[in-house]
C-alpha cells in the first residue's frame, strides 16, 4: 500500500473510529498496524522538516497511534524483575536478540523503556529513560537518566537530553503539533519542553527551564518576546517577569519566563559538547 493510500485509509478510519474495537479485523487493523510499523522503523515520522524551513506535521500518523489504542486490549507483559506490566502497547525491543540490537546500532542501558512505534536511530544512547509511542530520536543523541520523550516528539541528531528532562507529548492533552528538538541541541537537567514548542538547532537550554506554548521567551539583548519557538543557537535560562500590582497597590507575584541570555559561543560549546567515545 502506498503512503497516500495508507493516509487516506487512516483518515477514513478516524472518521468512523467509534465503530472500532479490539474485535476489529481485516483492512482496518492492517492499515493501523502498517502505520505503526512505518513509524517504528523510521520510514515515516509524525513531523518532518520542510525545505523552506519550519516543520510539517503528519496528522494522520497521530491518528494512527490513537486508533491503535482502540484496537488493542491490555495484556500482561514481563516487567523488571518480579514486576509485570499490563498495557495495550508492546515494548519495542520485545523478543530482540543480539543480532537485532547489533543491526539497530544503538545502546540501551537496563531500565530504558521504549514503546512500539517509536524510532531509535543508530548511534543513540538510551540511559534508564522512557520513549513513548510515535517518537523519533535521531542519530548520535543521548537520552539521559530519567528523561522522558513524549508521544510523537521529534528529537534531532547529536542532542543531549539531560537527566530528568521532560519532552512533552501530543496525545494527552491533545496537541496540534509535537515538540521538536532540532539537531545539536543541549537540554539541561530537569527542564521541560512541552505543548508543541520547537527548539531550533544548536540551542542550549539551561537546567530547570520550563517552556510551554504560552511561556514568554524573552531575548535579553533586544527585548523581543517569542512564544513556542527558541531561535537557533540560543542560550536560554530560567527567569521571571514582575507581576501586575495587586488591588491594594502592593507588588503582584512574578511570572516565570525563559530568557535568551546570549547566542552559543565557543565557551558554551566546550561545556555542552557531546562525547563521541560514549557513542562508539
UniProtKB/Swiss-Prot annotation:
<keyword id="KW-0220">Diaminopimelate biosynthesis</keyword>
<comment type="similarity">
    <text>Belongs to the transferase hexapeptide repeat family.</text>
</comment>
<dbReference type="GO" id="GO:0008666">
    <property type="term" value="F:2,3,4,5-tetrahydropyridine-2,6-dicarboxylate N-succinyltransferase activity"/>
</dbReference>
<dbReference type="InterPro" id="IPR011004">
    <property type="entry name" value="Trimer_LpxA-like_sf"/>
</dbReference>
<dbReference type="Pfam" id="PF14805">
    <property type="entry name" value="THDPS_N_2"/>
</dbReference>
<dbReference type="InterPro" id="IPR037133">
    <property type="entry name" value="THP_succinylTrfase_N_sf"/>
</dbReference>
<comment type="subunit">
    <text>Homotrimer.</text>
</comment>
<keyword id="KW-0808">Transferase</keyword>
<dbReference type="InterPro" id="IPR001451">
    <property type="entry name" value="Hexapep"/>
</dbReference>
<dbReference type="GO" id="GO:0005737">
    <property type="term" value="C:cytoplasm"/>
</dbReference>
<keyword id="KW-0012">Acyltransferase</keyword>
<dbReference type="Pfam" id="PF14602">
    <property type="entry name" value="Hexapep_2"/>
</dbReference>
<keyword id="KW-0677">Repeat</keyword>
<dbReference type="GO" id="GO:0009089">
    <property type="term" value="P:lysine biosynthetic process via diaminopimelate"/>
</dbReference>
<dbReference type="GO" id="GO:0016779">
    <property type="term" value="F:nucleotidyltransferase activity"/>
</dbReference>
<keyword id="KW-0028">Amino-acid biosynthesis</keyword>
<dbReference type="InterPro" id="IPR023180">
    <property type="entry name" value="THP_succinylTrfase_dom1"/>
</dbReference>
<feature type="binding site">
    <location>
        <position position="107"/>
    </location>
    <ligand>
        <name>substrate</name>
    </ligand>
</feature>
<keyword id="KW-0457">Lysine biosynthesis</keyword>
<dbReference type="GO" id="GO:0019877">
    <property type="term" value="P:diaminopimelate biosynthetic process"/>
</dbReference>
<feature type="binding site">
    <location>
        <position position="144"/>
    </location>
    <ligand>
        <name>substrate</name>
    </ligand>
</feature>
<comment type="pathway">
    <text>Amino-acid biosynthesis; L-lysine biosynthesis via DAP pathway; LL-2,6-diaminopimelate from (S)-tetrahydrodipicolinate (succinylase route): step 1/3.</text>
</comment>
<keyword id="KW-0963">Cytoplasm</keyword>
<protein>
    <recommendedName>
        <fullName>2,3,4,5-tetrahydropyridine-2,6-dicarboxylate N-succinyltransferase</fullName>
        <ecNumber>2.3.1.117</ecNumber>
    </recommendedName>
</protein>
<dbReference type="InterPro" id="IPR005664">
    <property type="entry name" value="DapD_Trfase_Hexpep_rpt_fam"/>
</dbReference>
Amino acid at each position: 500500500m502506498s503512503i497516500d493510500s495508507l493516509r487516506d485509509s487512516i483518515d477514513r478510519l478516524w472518521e468512523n473510529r467509534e465503530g472500532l474495537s479490539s474485535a476489529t479485523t481485516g483492512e482496518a487493523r492492517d492499515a493501523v498496524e502498517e502505520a505503526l510499523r512505518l513509524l517504528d522503523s523510521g520510514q515515516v515520522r509524525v513531523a518532518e522538516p520542510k525545505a523552506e524551513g519550519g516543520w510539517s506535521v503528519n496528522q494522520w500518523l497521530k491518528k494512527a497511534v490513537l486508533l491503535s489504542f482502540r484496537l488493542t486490549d491490555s495484556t500482561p507483559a514481563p516487567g523488571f524483575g518480579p514486576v509485570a506490566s499490563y498495557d495495550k502497547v508492546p515494548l519495542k525491543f520485545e523478543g530482540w536478540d543480539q543480532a537485532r540490537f547489533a543491526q539497530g546500532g544503538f545502546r540501551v542501558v537496563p531500565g530504558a523503556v521504549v514503546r512500539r512505534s517509536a524510532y531509535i536511530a543508530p548511534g543513540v544512547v538510551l540511559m534508564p529513560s522512557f520513549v513513548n509511542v510515535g517518537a523519533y530520536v535521531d542519530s548520535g543523541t543521548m537520552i539521559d537518566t530519567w528523561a522522558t520523550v513524549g508521544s510523537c516528539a521529534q528529537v534531532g541528531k547529536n542532542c543531549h537530553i539531560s537527566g530528568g528532562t521532560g519532552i512533552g507529548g501530543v496525545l494527552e492533552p491533545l496537541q496540534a503539533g509535537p515538540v521538536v528538538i532540532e539537531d545539536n541541541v543541549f537540554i539541561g537537567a530537569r527542564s521541560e519542553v512541552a505543548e508543541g514548542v520547537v527548539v531550533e538547532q544548536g540551542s542550549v537550554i539551561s537546567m530547570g527551564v520550563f517552556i510551554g506554548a504560552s511561556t514568554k521567551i524573552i531575548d535579553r539583548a533586544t527585548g523581543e518576546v517569542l512564544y513556542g519557538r527558541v531561535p537557533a543557537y540560543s542560550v536560554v535560562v530560567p527567569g521571571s517577569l514582575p507581576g501586575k500590582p495587586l488591588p491594594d497597590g502592593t507588588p503582584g507575584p512574578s511570572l516565570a519566563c525563559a530568557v535568551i541570555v546570549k547566542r552559543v559561543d565557543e565557551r558554551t560549546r566546550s561545556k555542552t559538547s557531546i562525547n563521541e567515545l560514549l557513542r562508539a
